[in-house]
Amino acid sequence: MEPHSQEPDLKPIYHRLLSPLSLFPSKAKPPPEPPKRPSQDATPLQSIPLAKLKVGPLCRQVSKRLASSGRAARVTAKDRLRLTEVILEELKCNWREPPIEPILDYENNQKLRQRLESYVLISSEQLFVRYLHLLVTLPTSRRVFTESATLSRLAVNLARDCTVFLTSPDVYRCLLADFQTLLNLKHAQGGIVKLRPPPCPPGTFKLCPIPWPHSTGLDHMPCSSLNLNYLVQLSRPYDFPSEPEPDPVEELKSIPQLKSRQQLLWVPSMIKDKEIESRPSPMVPLPSHSPSSESHQFPTSPVHSWLQRGQSMPCLHEGWSLADELCLLPPSPHPLTPLILASESKPLPFRDIVAEDLKQKMKIMRMEWSRYSLLDSGLPPLLGVLTRRLTAQHHLEKLQQMIKSLQEEEASGKWDLQPPRIIPLHPQPVTVALKVHDQVIVQVATVQLSERYFNDSFHVEGAGVLYNHLTGELDGKAIEEMDADRLVGNTTGEVYKELMSRVSVSHLSFEEGDQIEPSADKDWSSYLASSFLHQDKHMPIINRNLVGFYSRRTSTPKPVPEKVPSLTLLPRHKSWDKRPNRHGVWMNWLKPSVSSEDYFKYLSFQESDFLHVIFQMYEKEAPVEVPVPVQEYLDIQQPPPLLQDEELEFMQGKWDWSSVIEDGSGPGRAYIHNLQQRLKRLWVMLEVPEQNRLDMVIKYSSNARLQQLPALIKAWEQVLKPIQKRESLLGRLEWFEQQASDPNRFFQKPDLLMNRLLEENRFRSYLQRKLNRMESNLVSLLERIESVFGEPVTFKGRSYLKKMKQDKVEMLYWLQQQRRIRNLTQAQKTFRQSCTFTGSSSQALVAPGNTPTTH
């Protein structure tokens, strides 16, 4: 009864306290809601078709929104346009109009389409601003690609993200699930729903490549990848329904009275934790629709719903703190500060704080170690790490059994190198149920195998790869050679190739022969009678190349000359039919002739293959190479030695008149004349110059050197023939290289070029082989002559031994110079002709393309 009596006394006090608050404006009241239409009006709305969400207007809205986004970013207009085009192209190509949901009414379908439209606009802006941020930061942090390459890479990634976050079927499914969840929650809470802002995805505020703050104007832009849940929650409509304002007096009455006599002590953290756990959570989780894997799904944002009421100050414990924004772990629980400190409370010592901190860390470590399997199973540490308690229990037991068996074998000292054989089970038949006429069930068993089995085990090792053509172990040519035996076409092609090589190249050159056939120089009328066949064998021969051909045919019987009829011996007045010996003459002529039976008998004994005759495939006899008779020339006659008193010092170009041979007559003069003739012949054949001839005359005209002259001439005559043969071969090689070493031959037709190159290589090898065989013996002969007589054998005034080492290279060099001279002459003529037409001769002469230029 006492409180009721005090109420009238407190009202004036309340009004006096609340009167100053009337100076402040009250909360803005929302306009009164229009009265709801009756249920009869809902039927006409269902007949009105929903507005289609077409891609054209949607792209215009997206383009307009992106044009006003990210203006502070320091990027060019071309880059902004490129990113905008990527987003719009993705929408134009892959956009699909959402279907009408039959479970929703007309109004909710319209709201769902508005929600989808807002989602597309927000997601496009988020992607656009994020890639603007990457476009600014990537070139600064990684100077690997150029700006254009970086823009291309970002455009490709943006197109992929647009497919995932804008046009993917998962987007519509996730939006529909979120819309239905909010709709159900709104109906459950009576139309009062308060939505919290969606959390940023984890890692949103990670450190960027450039330290903050950026100069890009994108400091509010997250630096990590987006996810579908975050964008869906970002597109939620934040409409807070209004409720009638409470009476201030009732608010004051609801404040509890403080008990000043009771002291507030420290509130233990465990009590707070229990209160938090026991408190019913009004959050409603949403289904997760993320394109990433299940192990990396981000936590969805809960939906909180509570009744609004007047609060003196916001509740900081249930709000969205900075730690939640940064996705940090919750701090360790500490006791809350009491409103009134007790007198008995004392500050904790430092040692106790450290001890409590260590206990908390040990508790966290035990929680982390409890996730893994304990190594108390008796296994070694390495094996224990590889096992898990739940997923590898069977494997763990097998390892324990194996270790136990190994330990028993080690303790017993008996090692069984071969594993125990498992006796195979007898094969059991397999029965198959079969219905016959839908009445009788017959079980058909398979054939039972034999009970015999092998006691020995068989081990077949698989053959490795012989070669791997992908790594370049075998080239294409080697593979073709390995497969040549399996292809019939290759062998046939080789046969035809060999046959065509026998055909003459000039078999189609009809113009090479005589255009007019010469007339015969014999009387053809005398060869028309049959009596001409038995005349002399050399008489009817017109082609002189066939002389002696009949002499090789020994099998042909020779007719008796007395019985051979002759037109010249017959009387002219008698007729041929009136001859009495007519029958005997014809029989004698028919006997040696060949009949048709003889011809067929001859063919039966011969081969039926005439291809070698058609294509002239005769066995070529190996060319008989006559070896140069150099070995017999090695026996050089030693000249008589010079006496000490007769030996005179020879000086080139100086003639000692006192040593000249005196003129005389007799056999000695004829001998000297013979030596002179032989020496002149050597000079002519070896093309010795005049100065060298004069030196030889001066040297060997003395009495002392005259005795060595016959041996010198004989040695030079022995080496003359090999030198001549080598020079002839060298001349053939020079004539051959004049055409074969011409670089212009490479510009001919390919089919002709290959055959020509093969023939050139074959002929060059043949000449080189003959030269090498000859030079090996010729070098030893020349060296011996030079060592015996003290002077070398010369050719054109040059030591032939030195010439053999250089003449091949010199020949190729001078052939090249001759071709250059011809090309320069031809170019000069062409230049002069062009100058005569143009009337200008001030231009420089340009060397042909195949002529190397020298500086």
Swiss-Prot record:
GO BP term, pick one: positive regulation of acrosome reaction
Region (Disordered): 23-43, 278-302
Protein name (record): Coiled-coil domain-containing protein 87
Tissue specificity remark: Specifically expressed in testis (at protein level). Not detected in other tissues tested (at protein level). In the testis, localizes to pachytene spermatocytes and spermatids.
Record field: compositional bias (Low complexity): 287-296
Keywords attached to this entry: Coiled coil, Differentiation, Fertilization, Spermatogenesis
Function text: Plays a role in spermatogenesis, where it is important for normal sperm head morphology. Also required for the acrosome reaction and thus normal male fertility.
Gene3D superfamilies according to UniProt: 1.20.58.1520
A Pfam family annotated for this UniProt entry: MAP65_ASE1
Family in the record: Belongs to the CCDC87 family.
Species this chain originates from: Mus musculus
